[in-house]
């Protein structure tokens, strides 16, 4: 009986050792997987925060763009209305100018007949084109400065 007891004891010890090894192996795997899960959860949280921040910035940039695009469109519309009013004669374009006097032989001496000051049509078009480009440049510059101050901090 002692031999049977020794074999059974050896088998029980082998089973206990094998079970201990298996438990230790699966415990190590559980610890490793838990660490990986925690690391991935932190990375996911950071990624979600970055996505939220980017979406907020995109909304801010879109609002900023819409604001300055509207201001630019309003300024261009105002410039076009001014151009149309000047062309139709409802408004006058005042520019400091000096008119050359025209002397007529039949007029009394010392009296000058001055010609009415007026821009040439090309100069008038150039004025409004320049004004429109200045407005565009100003609005683009304001929008860029606002973008840099708000988004590139």
UniProtKB/Swiss-Prot annotation:
Q: Which locations, inside or outside the cell, does it occupy? A: Host cell inner membrane
Stretches that traverse the bilayer: 4-24
Domain of life according to the entry: Viruses
Gene Ontology cellular component annotations, sorted alphabetically? host cell plasma membrane; membrane
Pfam families, per this entry?
Phage_lysis (PF03245)
Main localization category: host cell
Sorted keywords for this record are: Coiled coil, Cytolysis, Disulfide bond, Host cell inner membrane, Host cell lysis by virus, Host cell membrane, Host membrane, Membrane, Signal-anchor, Transmembrane, Transmembrane helix, Viral release from host cell
Topological domain (Periplasmic) residues are 25-153
Coiled-coil region: 65-92
* Keyword Metal-binding among record annotations: no
The reported result of mutating residue 99 to S is: Complete loss of disulfide-linked homodimers
GO terms for biological process? membrane fusion; viral release via disruption of host outer membrane
Protein purpose: Component of the spanin complex that disrupts the host outer membrane and participates in cell lysis during virus exit. The spanin complex conducts the final step in host lysis by disrupting the outer membrane after holin and endolysin have permeabilized the inner membrane and degraded the host peptidoglycans. Host outer membrane disruption is due to local fusion between the inner and outer membrane performed by the spanin complex.
Q: Which family does it belong to?
A: Belongs to the Lambdavirus i-spanin family.
Per the record, what about its domains? The coiled coil region is probably involved in host membrane fusion leading to lysis.
Please identify the protein, giving its name as recorded: Spanin, inner membrane subunit
Per the UniProt record, the source organism is Escherichia phage lambda (Bacteriophage lambda)
